[in-house]
């Protein structure tokens, strides 16, 4: 295949892109310096603030812009056929990370002097993976900048892998995406072409069901108790959680075990929420709401309410979800994370299906985080309609979701500077990856502003504002349509 010559337009874009990188680099270095001073002041005062968990607005904008520019740079300078092969093999990046996280390699490396690193043979004995194979996996991760090689077959954490040390919620997120979600994605090409599942948006007719070998919705399946040998051999495509090979779960008195995916899911929602959810704590004016009642609909174990409760001590919460999830929140999450809120009765827990009218009427805020992306449009209109029935004229609905931009831009969203893709391209990779994960697992959808407006209007609601936060996830504020026009 003959190479194609680059054009003058390519050269102009290359110069523009490198100029953007240069400007962003200066901003980032300046903001790093400001952060160092701020951290010193906070450490001496003992007070926590947004700057301890979030980059400044200037730093965030520079980070996403330079990441988008790096993607544009790769597009411009790569040999096209080489780039195609790179993309084709990128699934191995996530597999390598999943293997390392499953076997707790960041924690093992942190258990001794990180500067000196750990020989791969010692890592092998502690992980159960043959040392030469493990070395190849870690070399791959080091090449990606996820770990650090300090000598021949000697490895250590770097700043990226170190964020996984003693971080069970973030580890759970990697385990979630690397287990059942990955297996579902493997079946997606087949189910897209199937005349039954291809056009369907039913939550029981997805690539996930094809991979698992069940007709149940995912939420029912992960709540099952089964025979221990079923955890690693479902008889279908899904191999289960690998660590169970070396660390099997003991059965209960009934001879059954809980699926580990339920606990992983609960922790993963906390972990993912901490990564992208910190901005929602500080980039929305919660302080102005005083002692408002916030109903977290489908709130899981209450991961976001945990974050809010520690920063805004006057807010009150009702957390609603399925029974087993609420039980997990009451028994193992809140007693450890915020026992004071339980004692002071600032938080209540309620078993509730969001396909029924919300039993809490007239709350100040109804909060939907990562719920609507689980469902196709008809389901979403049903969910939203039942919330609207319970809303008072003063009530507001906050929807915490990815708001999808495209490479050509959207008038409701901020665009990246030219010649970068309007949606910040490389920076938005995770958003688009999660969109396809939703498609494969539950026929869910990550929506554009217009798609959100459509389902809100159908439910008798109106979009008031999109709060673009220091995150890939935004807040959409909606009110009753009749309240907006009153």
Swiss-Prot record:
It comes from the Eukaryota. Its EC number is 2.1.1.283. Pathway: Secondary metabolite biosynthesis. The active site is at 373 (proton acceptor). The keyword Transferase applies. The keyword Nuclease does not apply. One of its GO terms (molecular function) is protein dimerization activity. Optimum pH is 7.0-8.0. Geodin shows the glucose uptake stimulator activity towards rat adipocytes. Geodin also enhances the fibrinolytic activity of vascular endothelial cells. It catalyses: emodin + S-adenosyl-L-methionine = questin + S-adenosyl-L-homocysteine + H(+). Keywords: Methyltransferase, S-adenosyl-L-methionine, Transferase. It holds the Pfam family Dimerisation. S-adenosyl-L-methionine binds at residues 298-299, 321, 353-354, 369. GO terms for biological process: methylation; secondary metabolite biosynthetic process. InterPro entries: COMT-like, O_MeTrfase_dom, Plant_O-MeTrfase_dimerisation, SAM-dependent_MTases_sf, WH-like_DNA-bd_sf, WH_DNA-bd_sf. O-methyltransferase; part of the gene cluster that mediates the biosynthesis of geodin, an intermediate in the biosynthesis of other natural products. The pathway begins with the synthesis of atrochrysone thioester by the polyketide synthase (PKS) gedC. The atrochrysone carboxyl ACP thioesterase gedB then breaks the thioester bond and releases the atrochrysone carboxylic acid from gedC. The atrochrysone carboxylic acid is then converted to atrochrysone which is further transformed into emodinanthrone. Belongs to the class I-like SAM-binding methyltransferase superfamily. Cation-independent O-methyltransferase family. This is O-methyltransferase gedA. It comes from Aspergillus terreus (strain NIH 2624 / FGSC A1156). The lineage of its organism: Eukaryota, Fungi, Dikarya, Ascomycota, Pezizomycotina.
